[in-house]
Amino acid sequence: MRDGSARPASPRLGLADAVSIIVGIVVGTAIFKAPPLVFANVSSPVTGLGLWLAGGVLALVGACCYAELAAAYPHSGGDYDYQRRAFGRLAGFMFGWAHLSVIITASIAQMAYVFADYAGELVPLSERAKLGVALGVVLLVTGANLRGLVAGKNLQNVLTVAKTLGLVAVIAAGFTIYFAMPEARPAAAAAERSASSPAIGLAMVFVLYAFGGWNDSAFVASEVESPHRNMPLALLAGLSAITALYVLANLAYLSGLGWIGLCASDAPAAELVERASGASGKVVVSLLVMVSALGAVNGMALTGSRVYARLGQEHRLFRWLGMWDEVRHTPARSLIAQAAVSCFMIGLVGTDVGRASVDQVVGWLGVHSVPWSDGGFDVLVRATAPVFWFFFLLTGIAFFVLRHGDGATRRPFRTPLYPLTPILFCATCGYMLYSSATYAQGLVLIGLVPLAAGPLLYWLVDRRSDSDQHLTS
């Protein structure tokens, strides 16, 4: 491996590759787990479907904002670049540090363990074996991306096609039950239940969680061919396709299981497959979820590593992350660092020693009980989600700052219905920040502890180089 370049390679990602990354990251495991939680908190099936459609519309609202930013500033790192330009070097540093220490690495760890958990549905696995499988997933995906951008994108394309076809098969199973198997069709619900606004608000949280991750595609904007054209197209086409898949999947769940049956189901996709074909739905859906989780891990590993590479190019503390492999056109050191932190997190919440260490640290901060019985990796998601939404909101605010403060930059794509569109995007992020922080309660401190080290690192080491000339991609 030769690390002779501090800049990303020439563009090697086409429009289809960019769409594949978006679909691959967003369509993870939530569409198989969230629907019962959504429909249990609404007053009618129509309301539930409306929330899924509204979630897609809100995601598209955000995508319109990112489309303008990505087309105007098609640089490596995405949000890192936007926030640095809008708020200064410290803001960019904090975004990169947050993603390395909390956001992307925790998401990779969580998805890797989901893969291991569902592998345990196919083959009996001890907790130690699941831990090994999760670590293996991170190392496997990292190894594939270390082979180069082409290898990483090819793996992403295969996994995205596989998970999309699998989800289409689940959708087909639901409609088959409704139209071709009337004897298996669920009986209509006798009455509707009432749901208060807070319940609908909670349902919306689950919906928006299922749409999360699409913004990661902006991290690789500098490697996309004709980014001024293809980044807006990829964002809008990718999220439109995801919205259609999600609405159809939920309609299929309702068609095959009924509203009451869906609310009561722990595994709606598995039940649909079993009713429609008689095959073991548990096996089929476990394989599908594993493919979905693997695709999400690969997409996050591919895109996230570009953020740390950009961090290394501009901040001497992380300069070692900023070098690119000239031969394979990939930020190898960033990929390795990302894998190391993700594996550390798997060990931290997946072992008794790690959980005891977390208990001790949060105990010092006044949180006396971490609900490990809910699942260690669910705790990880709850602890880090507020950090994600905070930085997402900052990008929304950066949109306004850059639109008004950098009017000289050409904008090949302009967000429609300005300023309503970015205001709605910021409002959505603010609502999710509040909701996720309320849901996490004291657990949010787990995510804030590593984040709090960021300003200290910056002021002790990096602020003296503010006037230096730094590399930009």
What are these regions (language model features)?
Residues L37-A40, L60-V138, T142-L146, M290-R310, ...:
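Hydrophobic transmembrane alpha-helices that form the core helical bundles
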Residues D81-Y82, G88, G120-L125, L236-N298, ...:
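TM-loop-TM module centered on a large, flexible mid-protein loop between adjacent transmembrane helices
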Residues R2-A9, G48-L49, L125-G132, V158-L287, ...:
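Helix-loop-helix junctions that connect adjacent transmembrane segments
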Residues P36-V38, E68, Y80, R84-A86, ...:
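Helix-loop junctions at the membrane interface of multi-pass solute transporters
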Residues M1-L13, V367, G396-T421, Y439-S473:
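Terminal cytosolic tails of multi-pass membrane transporters
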Residues M1-V46, L53, L60-C64, H75-S76, ...:
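Membrane-interface "cap" regions at the ends of multi-pass membrane proteins
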Residues L155, L321-R328, W389-A440:
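C-terminal membrane-solvent junction of multi-pass transporters and transport-like membrane proteins
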Residues L51-A54, L122-L149, L167-V170, L335-A340, ...:
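Transmembrane alpha-helical segments of multi-pass small-molecule transport proteins
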